[in-house]
Amino acid sequence: MSGAFYETYIVSELVKNFYAHGKTPKDFLFYYRDTDQKEIDLLYVDGSTICPIEIKQGIAPKKATKNFSVLDKYHLNIATGLVIDSCDKIRPLNEQTYYIPVYLI
């Protein structure tokens, strides 16, 4: 499965999950890309807290969170980041980010 199809599948599953819980996804999920073309696949916004999410097809991609730091300039409350990938269990990437297996979404 190509990366674009994989991302579409994950986002579709997340959207279905929101609707299943009576929430409108467009109120919570956003895409980020700045003028330097740095992007983050999803931003989950809940009140004043933002959780950056990257979707990667491989297992434990090391550079998955390289663009999370672009959010620092906005001085917002940034929650623990997530990398949804093909790993087998939840595990930390670092102090601020966790790998989440795709089968848990």
Where are these regions (language model features)?
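A cross-kingdom feature that marks ATP-driven nucleic-acid transaction machinery
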Residues: 1-105
